Amino acid sequence: MAKHPRKRRPRGRRILILLLLALLCAGFFRWSNHSLQVERLTFSSSRLPEGFDGCTVVVLADLHGAVFGEDNQRLLETVSNQAPDVILLAGDLLDRFRETPHSYAVDLGRRLAAIAPTYFVTGNHEWALPDVPALKEALTEAGVTVLDNRFVTLERGGDQILLAGVDDPNGYADQKTPEELAEEVHAAWGDGFWLLLAHRNNLFAPRYSRLGADLVISGHGHGGMIRLPFTDGLISVERTLFPSYTAGFYEENSSTAFISRGLGNSGPSFRLFNRPEVAVLTLSRS
């Protein structure tokens, strides 16, 4: 039987298909790293004062100098559309690899503070760049409350809760410890409801969960960078595999943590199946 030559697909068509696939992958990768995702969650507690039932808290973490829209306008509009009562900045506004200037944080902080009362704690990247005191002073002048190992009271509906914040452990060797701050909180506040803003997610279980806060709010973990089903992400910021405590709510020692997946990337890192997150927490009295 005579053999017939196999028909070959034109080489040009194969190249075109590969180019289209490459463009689709590039588009998806860009979308994964630059398309904002509003994540709405509810934190319920019977200890929450009635006046704070329905309070809206926007959490922004780990921007690392990222820009969403011209002058961050897309991010600012997204935050404003949530009508927040409070905005919490959970550290790493700046990035040591890009050497993000203070002006980035100050401009963003000023515009966020025009939307709602805004509170900030440092992350490890702030301390890897020069002159943290100057950054804190500039943010304060811009209308942002810097919680450097201290606490403030928040008021709503005739009730009060307490918000405390700690500097990143990469700060000064003699800075107040979280445990010392917690002692001050309990001395001033007794058994009242309080929140703790602290950058590092990986310190919740061993340390922050033992301080007595009702809710600890953190970032740092970048959602595990690559989100896979049934995992907390693939890679930690310390470059270990399958990290824990990277996104959402966790409970330890009668305390709850909310961990933001964050917004930006540090240096050569990236996101996959893990879009930049604007977290919107609704406090609920249950």
Model-derived regions, located:
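Membrane-embedded segments
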Residues: 55-150
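Hydrophobic residues on conserved beta-strands that form the core of alpha/beta folds
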Residues: 38-40, 60, 163
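Short, mixed charged/polar active-site loops
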Residues: 38, 54-56, 160
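Short, flexible hinge/linker loops that cap or flank conserved catalytic cores
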Residues: 50-52, 81, 112, 155, ...
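His/Asp/Glu-enriched short active-site or ligand-binding loop at hydrolase and phosphoryl-transfer sites
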Residues: 223-229
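Conserved catalytic scaffold of divalent metal-dependent phosphoesterases
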Residues: 47-48, 65, 127-215, 221, ...
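Short, charged, solvent-exposed linker or helix-capping segments at domain edges/interfaces
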Residues: 53-57, 174-177
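N-terminal membrane-anchoring alpha-helices
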Residues: 1-51
